[in-house]
Amino acid sequence: MTQEHNAAVLDLNPTFSTLIFFVNGKKVIDTNPDPECTLLTYLREKLRLCGTKLGCGEGGCGACTVMISRIDTLTNRIKHIAVNACLTPVCAMHGSAVTTVEGIGSTRTRLHPVQERLAKAHGSQCGFCTPGIVMSMYALLRNLSQPSMKDLEIAFQGNLCRCTGYRPILEGYKTFTKEFGCAMGDKCCKVNGNKCGEGMENGGDMVDDKLFEKSEFVPFDPSQEPIFPPELQLNKDWDSQTLVYKGERATWYRPGNLEDLLKIKAQFPEAKLVVGNTEIGVEVKFKHFLYPVLVNPTKVKEMIDVQELEDSIYFGASVSLMDIDRILRSSIEKLPEHQTRFFQCAVNMLHYFAGKQIRNVASLGGNIMTGSPISDMNPVLMAGAVKFKVAKYVEGQIKYREVCMASGFFTGYRKNVIEPTEILVGLYFPKTLEHQYVVAFKQAKRRDDDIAIVNAAINVFIDPRSITVDKVYMAFGGMAPTTVLATRTADIMVKQQWNKVLMERVVENLCAELPLAPSAPGGMIAYRRSLVVSLFFKAYLTITQQLIKSGILPQDSLPQEELSGSDVFHTPALKSAQLFEKVSNKQSECDPIGRPKIHASALKQATGEAIYCDDMPRMENELYLALVLSTKAHAKILSIDASEALAMPGVHAFFSSKDITQHENEVGPVFHDEEVFASDMVYCQGQVIGAIAADNPNFSSKTARKVTIEYEDIKPVIITIEQAIEHKSYFPDYPRFTEIGDVEKAFSEADHVYEGSCRMGGQEHFYLETHASLAVPRDSDEIEIFCSTQHPSEVQKLVAHVLSTSAHRVVCRAKRLGGGFGGKESRAIAVALPVALACHRLRRPIRCMLDRDEDMMITGTRHPFLFKYKIAFTSEGRLTGCYIECYNNAGWSMDLSFSVLERAMFHFENCYKIPNIKVGGWVCKTNLPSNTAFRGFGGPQGMFAGEHIIRDVARILGKDYLEIMKQNFYKEGDITHYQQKLDNFPIEKCFYDCLQQSNYYQKRKEIEEFNRNHRWRKRGISLVPTKYGIAFGVSHLNQAGALINIYADGSVLLSHGGVEIGQGLHTKMIQCCARALQIPIEFIHISETATDKVPNTSPTAASSGSDLNGMAVLDACEKLNKRLAPIKEANPNGSWTEWINKAYFERVSLSATGFYRMPDIGYDPVQNPNALMYNYFTNGVGSSIVEIDCLTGDHQVLSTDIVMDIGSSLNPAIDIGQIEGAFMQGYGLFTLEEMIYSPQGVLYSRGPGMYKLPGFADIPGEFNVTILTGAANPRAVYSSKAVGEPPLFIGCSVFFAIKEAITSARLMNGLSEDFKLESPATSARIRMACQDEFTNLIEQPPAGSYVPWNIVP
């Protein structure tokens, strides 16, 4: 890392310095490849193949997945693997064939079945993840033409999707599998004797179950796939060539033999061996390491060799993890079971090691030498006492030695006994003995593709006659700077009988041998310590059951209810059903309303042809902007020195607050309390201080780090809500209160009064496309902004403000967004404004797309909330009064926090009538990035408190919480605490339908029986309703415009004020327009959202996109229809094109604007008390069943049933996709997704490595969605209802089901059912809430006696 790059290139065997590979069948020759360049950068920047996306840059999201094909040296066969292009060095591609999403199919030619089925099964919403998912499936099919569902599960371990909820992707790709059948599974309509696809009766309404027609799919013929380039297949020199690529800062070597490899290492001891680049790539990108010498050993025979020996299998250190897995599985099938226990243990651990794209290229040697303390494989290797073959080049010859993976192997954090000039050549996986037992376990936040919190491997030799321990190795990761062996505890086990007494003794000794300091990196101290003993106990149970099975121990050696403690979760095959109202047979075939039409851009998204902001072609004189960010959370800026950066060639300018006036620098979505560039003070880490304009993105980011900033720290640094309360750090004019009735009287007259509290954390938006902007200078001092924003008009307005110009000289365009979820509503300005300023000053196009870590540092999250409440209720359970205090963590500026708080205050009662309410709200000012809009906008946080209240009442009264719900449900015509009458409010219908469809009461009985029979596994079931108000909180935003241009050929160009962010808004608007004009949807096109087409647009937010823009589209259509009416009347049998042609020649205007303002909106308790707060409410109910592992805190969602009232659906496929996607996002909010900050305000969770979204394996095993029928809504376009945000809170059903399961565990342990469980219900919180004899061994340090590693905001 510190080695200079001026060393001479070694004189090796004949070398080759030209990079040759194939991309989509075309030969690429590069005579000067850059060793620091990734394949992704090469594809996008040099070859302009932009279908492959940059989502995270660390191999954690799969958006960059491509397929690599090459001749496998081990088998001499063509091998196809999916890889992460963001980590793959382009220099490693020599002699390979790369296939990108563009290379398998196109809308211009023909779609590949992989692309077609994903699109037509509605598996693409925003589309940014789609190319990566397509390529993961394509690579699987190139290896297995008919895979199993298990193969699909493994193939998608490394892919994330933030929009769909994964179900439609799996449904589409299930059609390729052996298990393919009816998508309805057990709920297939044929079970009831109905003919599939003809609809079913449901309460008098005809319902449909078919979102796509499988029979229309193009058959998959694997024989028609492109051939491997013959040039690569016929020329045998590709693998034997010694390659040397010398770049500006680094040299890449690919030696052809071990001697040359060792010579390089002898000459350059600090040289890095690169196999998969999965560790080094992350270090280079995010830690900014520079490695001048990179060596690729994948063509050295000894490093890739595999040999089966008498007592072991030898693996070269460069053999990929997937190859190791395949070979071990083959050996497990062939060899006696007792010989393969170590192999089985390794295979089990490899399944959860990263994603498949990583395992396809990562090597075990790299994992060992990296020496991560949370490596998944190192504990297995250490417990197995695996031997390594090590070599170095000394005095003209190769010298070998053997090293054992023992307690002394690691000498410190990421250090080991292998010398700098030595190389780990290979390792020996031992075959096990008959009475040797090896098991391993891993606990992470998410099962698939996640780093371990703690992992363990136990290798024990047991004398079958005395049933005593002969020898034992116990290795643990996550408990020290290195993987460690618990040698002291192992010593006391020798010669002891394997029984419960020994287990208890071991557990106590492990607690003593493996302590953790209260401030240890990684946090979760008590949880990690408990995992050590829990994982050993699971190993004890597993090995004991093996001893019972082999007859060494009697059958009654373990109580029956204890057996489940050894189990691990496995992903079940998905079962699902989607039920929606069937379109009437009387409806015209060309009328698309109510039909499951595919997303308008789905086919382009599946082929990589859909263009996102950063996919736009580079302009000749374009510059790239990199932001300079604050490294302090609260400090005064003493000086900014950009001289070193400006002196570097290729740097054109540095911008800071000195380059604009104070007035121009003051910005914000409502209150101008932010700055484009921090001037005198910084209030959070990640605040923008300046920007560097340079020739290319990699260079600009490097030079931005050369800007030196001196600070003076300011105290206090306020991070948490509790700290804000302690320091009374609130925004002005807060708290605010609203009330109805007489709360004090309710408390004085109540049978019961209870005080409680609940808390929930924030949530990162994690749209797959990060914030991006491109600004282009135009004539007459105009500027054009292409921006990934949900609010083009706000970007237009604030750009005009910063440039001191008028809005009519600024055009903001948004073609499509790779996700938004509210995070691109107001925060787009953090990128757009510096880009616009640089463009304006330099008069050159300027581009900026944030890296994932930058985006997460800068843009804010969902608001964390704290609620304190006091409730009054009768002995029967009827709520009579509530006083509640709502605190949200706003971050350093107001942004939209006041509106988020208001919605939480107006949603906390959820679906329940409370006659007397007083609610207060506090906007807490902290030293975090400004938190912002996020799908739900405070509603889910408020309803979270309401559901706690219901369950508190039920617990106190000893009643079923469902009975408390029934007693308190709002009725039709009831008045809320903000004076709104509830009309068309079918919450009870949803409630009872959900109870019936989920078979709730029967399932609960089964769960009770399960819990009685299982000590360490518990299940819970919970149901939650939701009531979500539809409208912007400020009345002026409840408006929309549209523009329709009909051209003389009859084609229609539709423009409206909404932005396509994946939610299908453009698709629905096309459907609305098609019905209104009575034309097929093929006539209509939407190009983009632009401020020069529709002015003064509202943000695409508040779930109001369809409601507002749809009505504006109808208004424009009505105007056109009136103009066309005489022409149609004169020629009633004419066609659309004939009518339009006639209108053109008669000089009838074929262009119309539409406008809509939502009526009756604008509630204000003082100024306008009779107005509505919301236009209407979208309702729904969901029920989920969860199983938890009480020993680890892991959980699995077994089933979810959702019934949603969304009026008359405009498009059932898109609406069900929104319901499922929102549910999964809500599930993540309440269980997996945790923002991790240091006490100093440093965000630790800055990418998918530390921040965990739900993955494919996290969806409910059975996932059923029903759209309520017969519930037309008179207050929105074509009787529909908004759907984007309302279903999200139903994800909370999982949280409360987890809490029910924990309660069962606690009751079995004799503990109170009254306990706190904060959201998200992470594995750590679940485990520590269960409380048992193992957690009781963990001593907690006194509060305030230490500074924790992380805190909860």
UniProtKB/Swiss-Prot annotation:
InterPro entries noted in UniProt: 2Fe-2S-bd, 2Fe-2S-bd_dom_sf, 2Fe-2S_ferredoxin-like_sf, 2Fe-2S_ferredoxin-type, 2Fe2S_fd_BS, Ald_Oxase/Xan_DH_a/b, Ald_Oxase/Xan_DH_a/b_sf, Ald_Oxase/xanthine_DH-like
Cofactor: FAD; Mo-molybdopterin; [2Fe-2S] cluster
Membrane-spanning ranges: none
Domain (FAD-binding PCMH-type) ranges: 245-434
Keywords per UniProt: 2Fe-2S, FAD, Flavoprotein, Iron, Iron-sulfur, Metal-binding, Molybdenum, NAD, Oxidoreductase, Peroxisome
Residues the record lists as binding [2Fe-2S] cluster 1: C56, C61, C64, C86
Residues that bind substrate: E825, R903, F937
Positions annotated to bind [2Fe-2S] cluster 2: C126, C129, C161, C163
GO molecular function, one term: iron ion binding
Pfam families registered for this protein in UniProt: Ald_Xan_dh_C (PF01315), CO_deh_flav_C (PF03450), FAD_binding_5 (PF00941), Fer2 (PF00111), Fer2_2 (PF01799), MoCoBD_1 (PF02738), MoCoBD_2 (PF20256)
Domain 2Fe-2S ferredoxin-type: 17-104
Subcellular location field: Peroxisome
Active site: E1285
Catalytic activity entry: xanthine + NAD(+) + H2O = urate + NADH + H(+); hypoxanthine + NAD(+) + H2O = xanthine + NADH + H(+)
Main EC class the enzyme belongs to: oxidoreductase
Cofactor note: Binds 1 Mo-molybdopterin (Mo-MPT) cofactor per subunit.
EC number: 1.17.1.4
Origin: domain of life: Eukaryota
SUPFAM superfamilies the record matches: 2Fe-2S ferredoxin-like, CO dehydrogenase flavoprotein C-terminal domain-like, CO dehydrogenase ISP C-domain like, CO dehydrogenase molybdoprotein N-domain-like, FAD-binding/transporter-associated domain-like, Molybdenum cofactor-binding domain
Sites where the protein binds Mo-molybdopterin: Q790, F821, R935, A1102
Function: Key enzyme in purine degradation. Catalyzes the oxidation of hypoxanthine to xanthine. Catalyzes the oxidation of xanthine to uric acid.
Name of this protein: Xanthine dehydrogenase
Organism name: Calliphora vicina
Taxonomic lineage of the native organism: Eukaryota, Metazoa, Ecdysozoa, Arthropoda, Hexapoda
Encoding gene, per UniProt annotation: XDH
